[in-house]
Amino acid sequence: MKQKNSLLGMILCLTAAVVWGLAFSAQAVALEQVGAATLNAARCLIAGLVLIPVILIFDSKTDRRLFSAKEGKLRLDVRKKEWIGGAVCGVLLSIATILQQLGLATEETDAGKAAFITTLYVVIVPLFGLLRGKFPSLRIWLCIGAAVVGLYLLAVPVTDGGFSFRMAYGDLLVLLCAVVFSLHVIAIDVFSAETDGIRLSCIQFFTSAVVPSLVMIFTETPTLAGIWAAILPILYLAVFSSGVAYTCQIVGQQHLDVSIAPIVLSLESVFGLIGGAIFLHETKTPLQYVGCAVVLLAVILSQLNPRKKR
């Protein structure tokens, strides 16, 4: 039975990684029709709506039902920490995704490259642990160093005069996105311990829809024609990348060892590279492929715990 659960967890986490990886290509396609703020607002609004039925299903098995048939109305019994946590996580998520999408909108940053740079958040998280008095181990520092080398090979262009030390603007935006995603992971870690994960995510998505909506009003002029032209990638991002993949991650991690799940989920970078090659016909130089391999290796090694006994 245990083996069956482990297999289920592996399949679900791998499904989440595939969906998230292909989401980079979906974002690139959608950004050809709508602005980053418009895309993020539409995506998060739909994602929040998609999670409401999921909440109803899960709450029907508990005494914290969102809908009360007896009262005939919605019971707003979400605890204060869920509202605060969802709002904080939502603001961070909206900033991270807008930075990512602005980077993808540039010519020099493609979906495959963005996928690997974004995955660096796994390595960056331990650095923020310094602010909480948690000093990273030597293994983590080595992984951080390897990640920097991989990022250099992946993102810094090679000219006739040799290697350049100038990072492309789009790649820099995606790197900033990885930093904000690191803060997002820490925020989830802080708030998720005493909150319902799906409710927290739902509030997060609705908050994440408000922030870019305000940006959209002042900086973009979205049209119904543009939104309709991008409706398929928007629905993919909202329903599959947010609703389905998030649920797969939650259930999958319940059946998979805590040291294995992050490694499987980090494979989204590989599927992001594959998706960019298949759907967007993206290509990489040999050095960039080496950079991808180094980044992936650094991410995987950072999640391994040699002291953990099974």
Q: Which positions does each model-derived feature cover?
A:
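Glycine-/small-residue-enriched transmembrane alpha-helix faces in small-molecule transporters
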Residues: 1-42, 47, 90-91, 95, ...
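C-terminal-most transmembrane helix of multi-pass membrane proteins
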Residues: 2, 44, 56-60, 230-232, ...
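Hydrophobic alpha-helical transmembrane segments of multi-pass integral membrane proteins
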Residues: 7-12, 38-58, 84, 88, ...
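Helix-helix packing/entry segments at the starts of transmembrane helices
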Residues: 17, 40-42, 114-120, 187-209, ...
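Specific transmembrane alpha-helical segments of multi-pass solute transporters/efflux pumps
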Residues: 23, 58-117, 153, 238-256
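Hydrophobic/aromatic residues within transmembrane alpha-helices
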Residues: 30, 39, 43, 103, ...
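C-terminal transmembrane-helix exit sites in multi-pass transporters
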Residues: 50, 54-55, 121-145, 270-290
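Hydrophobic transmembrane alpha-helices of multi-pass small-molecule transport proteins
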Residues: 51, 136-158, 212, 266, ...
